[in-house]
């Protein structure tokens, strides 16, 4: 399989080197029910959905959990400044997203639009993973990518 991790024209927290490592791991395990904690702007999510769609011939589900820019959510994480101000090094991206679309890439609505090709297979939950996971049936999950809050306690709780 010659699938390569794509960056698209959005912010991503996972560089292509590690994105390709994740794709390799998914290819080895061939999961049907994928959980990602820490969706951010949806770039990794879209790569995962595109790849699972190929290797599982459309027979997969993707569940994503994120705060989706919710400043009111009670958590012990520091919010990176770049999310709040949505600054881009590329001025064209700044114009396109902040002025033309007026869209926060980290919002639930934006990520849903970005994953619209897979909307029947994608389940997105807004909130703190420590709370959301308690209300999900995770028995079928056969692969989890944990990249949400990076504090020790949050990561430990997500596991």
Positions of predicted regions on the chain:
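S-adenosylmethionine/decaboxylated-SAM
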Residues: 3-159
């Amino acid at each position: 399989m010659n699938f390569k991790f794509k960056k698209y024209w959005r912010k991503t927290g996972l560089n292509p080197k590690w994105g390709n490592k994740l794709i390799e791991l998914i290819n080895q395990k061939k999961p049907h029910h994928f959980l990602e904690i820490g969706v951010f702007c949806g770039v990794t999510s879209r790569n995962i959905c595109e790849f699972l769609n190929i290797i599982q011939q459309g027979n997969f589900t993707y569940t994503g959990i994120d705060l989706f820019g919710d400043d009111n959510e009670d958590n012990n994480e520091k919010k990176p400044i770049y999310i709040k101000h949505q600054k881009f090094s590329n001025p064209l991206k700044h114009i396109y997203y902040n002025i033309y679309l007026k869209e926060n890439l980290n919002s639930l609505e934006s990520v849903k639009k970005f994953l619209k090709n897979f909307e029947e297979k994608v389940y997105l939950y807004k909130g703190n993973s420590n709370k959301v996971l308690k209300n999900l049936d995770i028995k079928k999950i056969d692969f989890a990518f944990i990249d949400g809050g990076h504090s020790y306690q949050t990561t430990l709780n997500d596991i």
